Amino acid sequence: MQDPNTFLLIPLIQSERKRKIFTKCQENGELSGMVHSEKETTELQFKRFYCSASKIPDQLMKDIVEQCIKDSEYAENLCNNVFNNEIVTSHEIRYKFQINVLKNLISELQANNVVVPDSMFDRLGSLMGMKEGEYVERVYLTDGGDKVLAKFSEAVNQLSMGTTGLSVWQASCDLANLFRLIPSEYNRILELGSGCGVSGIAIAKMNDCCVTLTDYDDNVLNLLEENIAKNDLKSDTEDSSANNNQATVRSLNWCDFDFSEWKEPTDLIIAADVVYDTALLASLCNVLNLLLRHSKAAIVACTRRNESSIECFEHHLKMAKLEIVEKFEYENGAYTIGENSYHYASIFPFFSTLKTPTIFYNIQPKNKLVF
């Protein structure tokens, strides 16, 4: 059996489901029953994808067009609330993406004999006159969708300067979303292979916590510093006595790791999109083994792109005497745990042409389990 003090994720997901059911039943004056997943408005869903420069799902685009057909003012309101919204116009959200969305929407509206507002054409014209830089921004919104939760610069190209660490990837977005369920009592977080810093910085913004972001490439470390500043997080050189919303950047080479420099305790270790290079997995698991001496658990998120890399990762975890306490998947806005599915829509949307779930691992030393 497991130690009752073992850190677990699955009960948090299940309890969130129960909370939604209980809240809905209270609203309906019922004591029992089921509840459908809380659904955002079509416009807010569209706004989330647009601000994060994530491809608009086909069904969502159809829903938007349908709304425009039903309501003659919907297209104008959409333009005001999304395309010309200050959140959008004040950030360098990928211009090519915005142009493509507007062109597709205008084409669909015209095909359905919907009057396209002048403001939509004007915005398209403005975007076509803008030049993309080497870096673009992704913007993620609060639960209400009216404010910016976190924003990140990333390289225009997924492979830039010889590294993939300058781009945002799926598992980092899904890991950030998972932490909406994790209590803020875990206020010291260490992230391995931070890349753009989506997971760690978003966690620092959502919770009252201090996050240490680590990577090795100099260009990636510089981008992390930029994204910390972009999100108004305190660095370790500033006074953090008022609150713990703080993020710092440190260089950490998995292949040349000096544990004596990392003896400060952390509550949780996190990592996303780090299980892709099998040549580095033994070193990664060694680092996890050492760091877990002073941490409750490590949460690793990865996409199922290559089954052999997943198997290799699990093999090296076993060799490092680390236990997979929990393993589950997230896809299409739902966690799959055994035969059960728990809907929990993401506020960190991400689109990939490769449709694959994100796998979550809760990793702990074997001696933390009592049999």
Swiss-Prot record:
Q: Which CDD domains match?
A: AdoMet_MTases (cd02440)
Query: Which organism is the protein's source?
Result: Caenorhabditis elegans
**Which cellular component, as a GO term, is one annotated location?**
protein-containing complex
| Coiled-coil regions listed in the entry | none
Question: What name goes with this protein?
Answer: Uncharacterized protein R08D7.4
One Pfam family assigned to this protein is Methyltransf_16
This entry's Gene Ontology molecular function terms read:
protein-lysine N-methyltransferase activity
Gene3D superfamilies in alphabetical order: Vaccinia Virus protein VP39 (3.40.50.150)
> Lineage from the top down?
Eukaryota, Metazoa, Ecdysozoa, Nematoda, Chromadorea
Which residues, if any, are the signal sequence? none
